[in-house]
Amino acid sequence: MATVDRWLLPDGIEEVLPPEAACIEVARRQVLDLFQSWGYEFVVTPHIEYLESLLTGAGSDLDLRTFKVIDPQSGRQMGFRADITPQVARIDAHTLKREGPSRLCYAGSVLHAQPRALSSSRSPIQLGAELYGDASPSSDVEVISLMLAMLQLADVPDVHMDLGHVGIYRGLARAAGLSGEVEQQLFDALQRKAIDEVVALTADLPQELASMLRALVDLCGGREVLDAARDRLAGAPAPVLAALNDLLAIAERLAARFPQLPLYFDLGELRGYHYHTGVVFAVFVPGVGQSIAQGGRYDDIGADFGRARPATGFSTDLKTLVTLGQAEIVLPSGGIWVPDSTDAALWQQVCQLRSEGQRVVQALPGQQASAAREADCDRQLIQHGEHWQVMPLAS
């Protein structure tokens, strides 16, 4: 690499400079305090793990997004975490082994071999919360409400939420007895809302099942979609009706709690189909081409760690949250400039001021008083006899 290129960073990898880094850290603390006030306990997961542990219970998408290296000590393949959610699921299932509901939260950098979308970061700061041990819609309502509280804290404007339930499609596909290949083809067609392909792929199915699978293309829109789904899926198998009832219950409770929140339903939206097992949700804002927070239910993941537990949760990118949020983040400003001196009384005064939460910057040898302004100091310590006093910095 030429000397002139040594400062270049890989595509999608960025450094965060002051004061933006300070804003991100303040926001991180505020959000984690919010999570704690809801009863969520903070956990820290490893940046790198053996690959089989890191990808256990996850879909192929995570495998493709994971940077892989060889451990020089063991010779085994390792991966840098691309998603913290499976790691937290392992903590709940294998390490904590609690019997009742468990609420956990996290915040940390992740690394993506491939970005989520064109021009997006490959080094986001993932932040999220997970609720384990309860399979009821109440848990889904709780984590969605917490996610919305987080967005309110950050003052993200014009939030819209998408809701769906992968159990509706999964139940219909199982009832139809689709092969793995055909199910994947139908899944892809539904994501693109390619009705002609959906019709062709369901042509050999019983008419009632074919009609219900085709209906998923059109069942998208406002609250009226759920009423239409009740009519068009009335003859569906019991698991499908149970999934629809869960989605209805969640939607009603969210509408009551957040009456101003626009809700959009898409029963053909199968985000995370190979990973999620129930309700799926995502938050969008105008002008941003991808979701800014997302989550859902994933009840099967704990089984891969020896203990299946109901689970639901969400995640977001803290950098995106700070960028889009309009909440005023007040950063500490000003400080006290201290001259370069070995005076013992000065050192005691500096220690006392720092213990009180004051920002104190001591001059280094050769630094002039003019450097105080560059260090964002607005006061200085001046010696009066044997004592040092804090005085305004001369302009």
Curated annotation (Swiss-Prot):
Belongs to the class-II aminoacyl-tRNA synthetase family. HisZ subfamily. Gene3D superfamilies: Bira Bifunctional Protein, Domain 2. This function is generally fulfilled by the C-terminal part of HisG, which is missing in some bacteria such as this one. One of its GO terms (biological process) is L-histidine biosynthetic process. This is ATP phosphoribosyltransferase regulatory subunit. One of its GO terms (cellular component) is cytoplasm. NCBIfam families: hisZ_biosyn_reg, PRK12292.1-1, PRK12292.1-4, PRK12421.1. Keywords: Amino-acid biosynthesis, Cytoplasm, Histidine biosynthesis. It holds the Pfam family tRNA-synt_His. InterPro entries: aa-tRNA-synth_II/BPL/LPL, HisRS-like_core, HisRS/HisZ, HisZ. It is found in: Cytoplasm. Pathway: Amino-acid biosynthesis; L-histidine biosynthesis; L-histidine from 5-phospho-alpha-D-ribose 1-diphosphate: step 1/9. Heteromultimer composed of HisG and HisZ subunits. Required for the first step of histidine biosynthesis. May allow the feedback regulation of ATP phosphoribosyltransferase activity by histidine. It comes from the Bacteria. Its main location: cytoplasm. It comes from Pseudomonas savastanoi pv. phaseolicola (strain 1448A / Race 6) (Pseudomonas syringae pv. phaseolicola (strain 1448A / Race 6)).
